[in-house]
């Protein structure tokens, strides 16, 4: 066996071979895949092979589409059939909430050209004649061009395609250890010898946690036992002249598909799901199945038999029962592993036949080019942190399995595995009626009041949030913002590091605060942070909590050899309380001797002071666009500071506000957000970040500068050289507002082809308007331009705004 490679992939299932195939097509043919048994011999071989197009995430929909596109073409390329059955699929909606969700999903799929139709019970029975009971069916979501494939055939065909280009595969080769080498490369130790590689990829399926443990990683994956049943041959199936589409049924929590002349039924039981191998899985297992458990399936089998009576009468020819990987949020892990250089993850898919090709495509782009053509935030391993313990992973993964075919409503944060991390004032806020969400393990208030009746339209929280916004805008509000990432960058070369990374100039005076964006080599927006200079060798950085590990790695991994720089993650030890609104100064003055006047403490500055006897870094910034301060302080002193602020705020009518109100008010101010408007496949030119990108200071360079200049020149002064640009708009919505991923249209185009997408929106309670951000054709960039947005099947007019709907001149921030 060879002893060196550019890249070693550990694991020969759908995910590993999907990556091998795409790396080879990207030119990385010096790649070796090692598999301890035969290809597919872990979980891949016993999968049902379903490949759905129905999914509510735009970027995951692109992953799924990549699979169907590839499987249709693989045989012509490789001579091996992937066993593709393009029979389409129908997902049943059995209540109004599901029907609303399906209308939203239809808009998402339309953006990338996936054809779908909403059909009635009669057409459902015509497509799938074995289904007789449709008494509870509101509608069906019919995707015409997906279906299913043979797991072994797809994997072997991708492997053959990679081999044709020069990639290699070593079967029956067990990895026993992985070690970092002093030169930055990796040593992969196997039972057949040692391999040194520039890159290593963990694609080990349900062995992923054990392979990750070799390098000190806790991989948040557990395996769930999944079973499916195959009936004896059915005369009714044999008589069906077409291959019925795959049917997914939320009532029975089952999928149904044809298997020759039999029916294959796969329940995702909604109770008593069983994990597998949480203490480790025997390395010697190959093509392993577990004993069937028909009792746990019986309630769901009975519901399936009500839907399809011939199933209840049929004999069961075979029961397949085996482990399938799951993660706490149901998504796979694809991208750089936290804290490590050139160690990558491509693992954890619960529908790997669907996701292997797309995951491989985008990870190959990431490895070769440094970024991807889609937003991979929801796939990245660093979306989890050390808080994602084994217990948490088990609880959440079981819940995800139980809810596989159920609707996740807007605002719904399921209780499984929670709470994990709470601030010291959790009980105080809970007593006030805080309705919680979990964000990167932290509990954060959404709003304060009665529990939310979840809805795709405006919910009962709408009026409650309106009162919170009014309280902040007219008086003063307090919010727990602890769930943000915080870093200290220190050392004589700290400014040099941050200057190389930041598209904007750094603050030049102690106490200065700037918003900066950090770019990829290709100009994509990698990070967004506020940078506060506390001294010439000491900087304090804040960013979105979801970027904690991502942003820390970005900073640390760009320190040059020999530089005097230290990057400390102080997120867990630092709490943040925000006091904001026109009376914020009055509240704080009652708690501190510091001079808070505008002359002494202007907007976008910070000072280290004491408030109520607590040492704080007070930053005069406000994400809601009002006079205000963020008070960053030791987390163990949070109760003291909070109690003092609440007491001082009582005479001023202080309100507590949560993330719902904050989002509504930031959109009124036209503030863009990382992960929504700002992502790696977008450059500052499309996003309209001109004033935050310094391209003109002589001699100043930063990562992504050259690519940004090229992009700016290609765009032209009228931006017509771009495919799309970000606009801020008012929408004539009635009872619902944009959430993101709604398609946008040119009203003069009769083709009904979507031209762009929204990234988020909200009702502006202060201005009385429904507001949104959207990427559209540059022809619609000018203020006053109108286009259309699809909301739940209806078209709504959007009008481009020239400036923020609330306080565009920032007078309130500067007060």
For every predicted segment, state its role.
Residues 18, 177-290, 299-310, 389-413, ...:
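Flavin-dependent oxidoreductases
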Residues 24-45:
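Glycine-rich FAD pyrophosphate-binding loop
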Residues 48-53, 89-91, 217-242, 299, ...:
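Central beta-strand plus flanking loop segment that forms part of the substrate or channel wall
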Residues 49-127, 251-256, 260-266, 398-410, ...:
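Dinucleotide-binding Rossmann-like beta1-alpha1 core, especially the glycine-rich loop
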Residues 73, 85, 94-171, 176-184, ...:
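Flavin (FAD/FMN) cofactor-binding and adjacent substrate-gating region
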Residues 251, 260, 280-417:
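C-terminal catalytic lobe of FAD-dependent flavoproteins
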Residues 381-519, 524-526:
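Acidic, proline/glycine-enriched N-terminal capping motif
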Residues 409-437, 444-446, 450, 457-460, ...:
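Conserved, structured C-terminal
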């Amino acid at each position: 066996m060879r002893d060196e490679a550019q890249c070693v992939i550990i694991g020969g299932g759908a995910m590993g071979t999907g990556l091998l195939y795409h790396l080879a097509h990207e030119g990385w043919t010096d790649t070796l895949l090692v598999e301890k048994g035969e290809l597919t011999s872990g979980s891949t071989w016993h999968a049902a092979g379903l490949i759905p197009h129905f999914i509510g995430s735009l970027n995951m929909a692109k992953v799924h589409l990549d699979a169907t596109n590839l499987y249709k073409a693989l045989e012509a390329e490789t001579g091996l059939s992937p066993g593709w059955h393009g029979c389409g699929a129908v997902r049943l909606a059995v209540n109004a909430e599901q029907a609303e969700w399906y209308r939203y999903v239809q808009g998402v799929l339309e953006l990338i050209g996936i054809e779908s139709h909403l059909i009635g019970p009669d057409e459902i029975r015509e497509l799938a004649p074995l289904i007789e009971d449709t008494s509870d069916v509101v509608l069906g979501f019919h995707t015409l061009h997906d279906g299913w494939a043979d797991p072994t055939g797809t994997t072997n065909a991708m492997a053959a395609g990679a081999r044709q280009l020069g990639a290699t595969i070593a079967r029956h080769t067990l990895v026993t250890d992985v070690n970092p080498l002093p030169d930055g490369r990796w040593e992969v130790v196997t039972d057949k010898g040692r391999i040194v590689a520039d890159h290593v990829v963990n694609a080990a399926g349900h062995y992923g946690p054990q392979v990750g443990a070799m390098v000190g990683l806790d991989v948040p994956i557990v395996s769930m036992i999944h079973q499916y049943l195959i009936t004896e041959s059915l005369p009714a199936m044999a008589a069906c002249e077409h291959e019925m589409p795959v049917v997914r049924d939320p009532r029975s929590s089952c999928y149904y598909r044809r298997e020759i002349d039999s029916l294959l039924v796969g329940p995702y039981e909604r109770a008593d799901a069983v994990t597998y191998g949480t203490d480790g899985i025997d390395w010697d297992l190959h093509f392993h199945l577990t004993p069937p458990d028909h009792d746990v399936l019986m309630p769901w089998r009975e519901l399936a038999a009500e839907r399809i009576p011939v199933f209840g009468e049929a004999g069961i020819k075979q029961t397949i029962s085996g482990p399938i990987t799951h993660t706490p949020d149901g998504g796979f892990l694809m991208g750089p592993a936290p804290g490590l250089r050139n160690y990558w993850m491509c693992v954890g898919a619960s529908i790997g036949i669907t996701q292997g090709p797309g995951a491989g495509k985008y990870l190959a782009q990431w490895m070769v080019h440094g970024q991807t053509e889609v937003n991979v935030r929801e796939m990245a391993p660093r979306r989890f942190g050390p808080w994602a313990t084994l217990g948490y992973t088990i609880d959440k993964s079981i819940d995800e399995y139980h809810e596989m075919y159920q609707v996740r409503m807007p605002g719904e944060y399921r209780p499984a595995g929670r709470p994990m991390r709470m601030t010291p004032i959790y009980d105080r806020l809970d007593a006030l009626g805080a309705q919680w969400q979990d964000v990167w393990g932290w509990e954060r208030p959404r709003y304060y009041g009665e529990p939310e009746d979840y809805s795709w339209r405006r919910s009962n929280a709408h009026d409650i949030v309106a009162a919170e916004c009014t309280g902040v805008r007219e008086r003063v509000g307090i919010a727990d913002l602890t769930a943000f990432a915080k870093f200290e960058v220190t050392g004589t070369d700290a400014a040099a590091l941050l200057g190389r990374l930041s598209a904007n100039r750094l603050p030049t005076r102690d106490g200065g605060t700037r918003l900066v964006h950090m770019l990829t080599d290709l100009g994509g927006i990698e990070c967004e942070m506020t940078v506060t200079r506390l001294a010439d060798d000491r900087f304090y950085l804040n960013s979105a909590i979801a970027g904690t590990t991502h942003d820390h790695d970005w900073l640390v991994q760009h320190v040059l050899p020999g530089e005097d720089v230290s990057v400390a993650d102080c997120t867990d030890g630092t709490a943040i309380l925000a006091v904001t609104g026109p009376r914020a100064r009055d509240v704080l003055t009652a708690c501190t001797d510091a001079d808070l006047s505008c002359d002494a403490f202007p907007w976008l500055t910070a000072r280290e002071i004491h408030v109520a006897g607590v040492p704080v870094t007070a930053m005069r910034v406000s994400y809601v666009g009002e006079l205000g301060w963020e008070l960053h302080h030791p987390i163990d002193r949070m109760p003291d500071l909070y109690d003092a602020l609440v007491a001082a705020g009582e005479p001023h009518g202080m309100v507590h506000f949560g993330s719902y109100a904050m989002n509504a008010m930031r959109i009124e101010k036209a503030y863009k957000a990382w992960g929504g408007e700002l992502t790696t496949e977008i450059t500052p030119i499309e996003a309209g970040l001109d004033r935050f990108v310094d391209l003109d200071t002589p001699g100043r360079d930063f990562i992504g500068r050259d690519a940004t200049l090229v992009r700016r020149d290609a765009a032209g002064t009228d931006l017509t050289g771009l495919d799309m640009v970000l606009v801020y708009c008012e929408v004539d919505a009635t009872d619902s507002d944009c959430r993101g991923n709604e398609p946008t249209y040119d009203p003069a185009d009769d083709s009904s082809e979507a031209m762009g997408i929204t990234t988020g929106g909200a009702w502006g309670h202060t201005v009385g308007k429904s507001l949104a951000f959207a990427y559209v054709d540059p022809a619609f960039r000018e203020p006053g331009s109108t286009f259309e947005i699809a909301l739940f099947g209806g078209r709504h007019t959007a009008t481009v705004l020239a400036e923020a709907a609330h306080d565009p001149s920032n007078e309130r921030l500067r007060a």
